């Protein structure tokens, strides 16, 4: 049986482990991220047979748009364990997450997905181009 629910603080290790499996980021980054950005009350999990196999994180994020403060949540870490992919789990957690964020009053949900096209079936499309600038020194 599968069930989608709001994450709990005690799910942090499962989120961390799934992030490492799916994205391969360094321990230093993951440690920082989960210490500073993990917000279980803004995140969702999908469990099957009592095991978290898919999750989506978000954390509160305020944007300034045309001089107005807009409440939102930054989406990140949408992940499904490789053994459980192609079962429609992303669609289930995405739908649940969007409902949760609406209930929390979030008007925008920006994200920087590793695979941008994976968000298209759920109605999330780019609204602006981005440029990354670096400087020496």
List each model region and its residues.
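A short, internal acetyl-CoA/4′-phosphopantetheine-binding micro-motif in the GNAT/acyltransferase core
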Residues: 75-85
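Core nucleotidyl-transferase/polymerase catalytic module
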Residues: 44, 53, 76, 114-116, ...
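Short amphipathic alpha-helix that is part of the acyltransferase structural core
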Residues: 1-60, 67-74, 137
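Short coil/turn motifs at secondary-structure junctions
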Residues: 61-63, 83, 116
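Extreme N-terminal leader/targeting regions
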Residues: 89, 107-108
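Conserved acetyl-CoA pyrophosphate-binding loop and the N-cap/start of the following alpha-helix
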Residues: 84-96
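Conserved active-site alpha-helix within GNAT-family acetyltransferase domains
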Residues: 102-107, 113-131
């Amino acid at each position: 049986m599968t069930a989608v629910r709001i994450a709990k603080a005690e799910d942090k290790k499962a989120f961390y482990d799934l992030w490492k499996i799916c994205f391969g980021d360094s321990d230093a980054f993951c440690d920082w991220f989960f210490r500073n950005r993990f917000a279980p009350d803004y995140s969702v999990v999908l469990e099957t047979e009592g095991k978290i196999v898919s999750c989506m994180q978000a954390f509160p994020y305020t944007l300034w748009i045309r001089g107005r403060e807009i409440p939102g949540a930054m989406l990140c870490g949408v992940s499904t364990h490789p053994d459980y992919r192609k079962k429609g789990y992303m669609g289930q957690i995405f739908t649940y997450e969007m409902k949760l964020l609406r209930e929390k009053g979030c008007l925008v949900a920006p994200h920087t997905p590793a695979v941008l096209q994976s968000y298209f079936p759920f109605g999330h499309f780019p609204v602006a181009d981005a440029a990354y600038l670096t400087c020496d020194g």
